[in-house]
Amino acid sequence: MTVEATNPVLFIDGPNPFYSQTDEDHFFAWLESIPAVKKVTGRGRGLELIVERPIDKESLRDLIALMTRYDVNRRPLKPLCDEQEDEYFRDGVRYWHSAVYG
């Protein structure tokens, strides 16, 4: 569940459970609306995302928000956060920081 500095492939866990078909539809609609997410493929219980690298900060913020909302493990986002220059992604008091950095 990691991604190398230039690797466009990101593996994440899928949300579990979805509470309705509409819930699932909204998750994938939001995920696919994020500009840096170029492709989404199911892999077992997880998802393989092809992401534009380096990822723009708004797309990364949206990924963090989506994964937080659906309680998806955020650790795979660490390399994406590490390559950001914006101090927002280094601020240890952000609501998502401990979920990404442990």
Describe the function of each predicted region.
Residues 54-102:
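Helix-rich interaction surfaces within compact, conserved domain-sized segments
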Residues 13-22:
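Short, surface-exposed ligand-recognition loops at beta-strand->loop->(often short) alpha-helix junctions
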Residues 21-25, 60-61:
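Conserved strand-to-helix beginnings and helix N-cap segments that scaffold or border functional pockets
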Residues 39-62:
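Short, intrinsically disordered low-complexity segments
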